[in-house]
């Protein structure tokens, strides 16, 4: 295919997809469904596809049985199952969006049957295939099958290879069926020479946030089992919504990639919505404005010192705002953004600009990712993102405030560190990489204080834990002083964080104390399952409270619906939760509420397994109104809230918010 034609046509397609939103989608009382309803499927074609689905299901089961002793079966079976899911869900959930997709569905069933037969015979030729390859994995989050696409160069020989990821644009009709059809037929907007390209599905159209963020890492881990990926030469790339994804992956994981090439999209929430939606969100509650830090790349611009970045915008594209905002943020950190402008372009990639990006990437990739920079500069706002090269932030003084670490290897026995809002950190250099002398006891000068610390080990690794107590830094034997409650990486909240790892929805088996609360719980719990499927493309795992096992508690974040009367697990953990809850009264953060008309939502370390979360009465916290623009798809509730059930549930909230806030660093109540 002609390269320029390929780029131009696909860019135009992306433009038509992303511009589906706009100021007309600012009416929270008139929210159109995302994804939209599909077209009617003629009965004859529907029946033929259902027959094909039944045959494919039988073939998949036969292949699984035939290969039951194959240790690679868990990684191979999803490559077949995804064909069944794609067609099944399109029919089951009215997600056939155009007549051509019916032909594509038949093709997918045929391809799935071929793979099932091959797998049953112990053959997996698609794992050695070059060109366009559909792949899939089973997610740890909800057990769902999630697709991704690979583009394998014809000369790929198994040698360590550069890999580029390409994050797709907004696609309200991008079902699994549509995505698989694209990944079978379209190379996409990039195809660099001698480069593997991975196209994540990203859990549909969420700008690769939350579970969509984890999707990238699960897809990369699966791909690495079959392709020899050079981990020092991974490039994150995308355009439009995919450009937004690139900005956030670049900002929050700057030490993982070799380069980033974001195009258009958005790089933060409030200013983009002002420009693109004519929507002023600065009246949002204070805790929502704190939560913008999660995905605002502008707030974490310092991290780009570790990641070569090439931004692109069309000259006439309103989404040029994304790179303009990043340019200003980087300038504030004394960095100058390389921002290529496509002359005369609206929401499209200019072929000349793409060629310039590719030319520059060749030089960047030749150098590769820095494995052991002598200087590290890192900023974050919460401990989900707590790591940059050899600096690990273990505890904060206060979550959702700007946190910074500047660390430098000065000599072979001296390290300088400056911190802001850090209570404990670890300096952790992997084996073979420490530039410090193993013969000298090094000194860490941290915030002006000199601390004599442990020497590097004989394998040239070096790990030092430092903690600040009463304003004084000292080395400690481990990262955490005791086993008490503390906010740390993976256990820091907010509510939405629980849905980025394995979770189990636990439903009540009895009536609760108050009918109004029961009614609200039923509506919200049902909505949680419905919206998880629609927005994150999986069936959430569900059990009744009486069916939950010790193994479930060990393996999952528990999402408990109900009250202490209706849900036995809420009753079990209530004593060790910070709330007080009786039939008459709910007490949260020192305030009392009538239990008949209020309900708590919160996240907390699970008293039954403190390595996991317990969540009370909540799923992911953005709602239907937020689906209309990807920049709105950010966390809407903090660690806890009290819901006023006398106020209606809406497209923006589960009811009235009587109060809400974050827990302190030891999961204690704190004043808002």
Where are these regions (language model features)?
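Solvent-exposed alpha-helical segments and adjacent loops
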Residues: 426-672
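Amphipathic, heptad-repeat alpha-helical segments
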Residues: 22-80
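A domain-start/cap signature at the N-terminus of enzymes
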Residues: 22-39, 93-161
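C-terminal catalytic histidine-bearing segment of alpha/beta-hydrolase fold enzymes
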Residues: 316-415, 421
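Catalytic His-Asp charge-relay segment
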Residues: 306-313, 338-339
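Gly/Ser-rich "nucleophile elbow"/oxyanion-hole loop immediately N-terminal to the catalytic nucleophile
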Residues: 155-159, 208-241, 251-257, 303
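Active-site machinery of serine-nucleophile hydrolases
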Residues: 160-227
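Mobile cap/lid helix-loop segments that gate and shape the active-site cleft of serine hydrolases
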Residues: 171-183, 255-307
């Amino acid at each position: 295919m002609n390269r320029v034609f390929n780029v131009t046509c696909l860019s135009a397609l992306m433009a038509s997809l992303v511009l589906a939103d706009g100021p007309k989608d600012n009416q929270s009382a008139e929210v159109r469904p995302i994804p939209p309803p599909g077209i009617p499927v003629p009965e004859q074609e529907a029946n033929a596809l259902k027959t094909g689905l039944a045959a494919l299901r039988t073939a998949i089961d036969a292949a699984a049985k035939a290969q039951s002793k194959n240790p690679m079966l868990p990684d191979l079976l999803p490559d077949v199952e995804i064909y069944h899911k794609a067609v099944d869900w399109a029919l089951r959930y009215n997600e056939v969006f155009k007549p051509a997709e019916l032909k594509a569905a038949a093709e997918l069933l045929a391809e799935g049957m071929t793979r099932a037969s091959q797998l049953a015979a112990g053959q997996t030729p698609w794992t050695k295939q070059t060109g366009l390859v559909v792949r899939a994995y089973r997610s740890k989050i909800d057990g769902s099958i999630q697709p991704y696409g690979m583009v394998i160069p014809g000369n790929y020989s198994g040698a360590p290879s550069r890999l580029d990821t390409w994050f797709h644009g907004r696609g309200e009709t991008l079902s699994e069926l549509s995505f698989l059809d694209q990944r079978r037929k379209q190379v996409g907007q990039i195809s660099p020479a001698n480069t593997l390209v991975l196209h994540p599905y990203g859990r549909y159209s969420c700008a690769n946030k939350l579970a969509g963020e984890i999707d990238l890492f699960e897809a990369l881990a699966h791909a690495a089992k079959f392709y020899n990926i050079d981990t020092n030469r991974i490039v994150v790339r995308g355009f439009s919504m995919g450009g937004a994804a690139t900005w956030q992956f670049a900002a929050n994981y700057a030490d993982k990639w070799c380069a980033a090439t974001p195009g258009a999209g958005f790089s933060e929430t409030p200013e983009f919505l002002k420009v693109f939606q004519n929507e002023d969100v600065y009246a949002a509650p204070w805790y929502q404005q704190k939560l913008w830090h999660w995905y605002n790349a502008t707030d974490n611009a310092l991290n780009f010192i570790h990641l070569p970045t090439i931004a692109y915008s069309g000259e006439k594209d309103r989404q040029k705002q994304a790179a303009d905002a990043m340019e200003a943020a980087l300038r504030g950190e004394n960095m100058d953004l390389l921002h290529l402008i496509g002359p005369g372009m609206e929401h499209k990639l200019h072929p000349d600009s793409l060629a310039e990006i590719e030319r520059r990437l060749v030089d960047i990739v030749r150098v590769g990712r820095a494995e052991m920079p002598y200087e590290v500069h890192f900023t974050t706002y919460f401990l989900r993102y707590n790591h940059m090269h050899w600096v690990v932030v273990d505890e904060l003084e206060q979550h959702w405030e700007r946190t910074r670490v500047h660390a430098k290897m000065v000599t072979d026995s001296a390290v300088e560190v400056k911190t802001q809002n850090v209570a404990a950190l670890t300096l952790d250099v992997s084996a073979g990489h420490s530039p410090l002398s193993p013969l000298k006891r090094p000194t860490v000068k941290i915030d002006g204080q000199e601390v004599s610390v442990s020497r590097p080990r004989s394998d040239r690794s070096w790990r030092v834990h430092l903690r600040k107590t009463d304003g004084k830094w000292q080395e400690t034997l481990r990262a955490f002083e005791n086993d008490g409650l503390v906010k740390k990486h993976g256990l820091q909240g907010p509510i939405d964080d629980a849905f980025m790892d394995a979770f189990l929805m636990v439903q009540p088996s009895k009536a609760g104390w108050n009918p109004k609360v029961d009614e609200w719980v039923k509506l919200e719990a049902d909505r949680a399952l419905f919206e998880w499927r629609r927005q994150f493309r999986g069936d959430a795992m569900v059990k009744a409270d009486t069916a939950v096992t010790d193994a479930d508690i060990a393996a999952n974040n528990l999402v408990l619906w109900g009250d202490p009367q209706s849900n036995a697990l809420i009753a079990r953990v209530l004593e060790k939760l910070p709330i007080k809850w009786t039939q008459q009264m709910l007490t949260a953060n020192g305030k009392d509420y009538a239990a008949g008309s209020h309900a708590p939502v919160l996240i907390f370390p699970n008293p039954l397994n403190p390595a996991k979360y317990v969540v009370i009465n909540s799923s992911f916290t953005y709602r239907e109104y937020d689906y209309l623009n990807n920049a709105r798809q950010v966390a809407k509730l903090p660690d806890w809230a009290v819901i006023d059930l006398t106020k209606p549930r809406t497209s923006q909230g589960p009811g009235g918010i009587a109060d809400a806030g974050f827990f302190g660093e030891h999961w204690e109540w704190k004043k808002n």
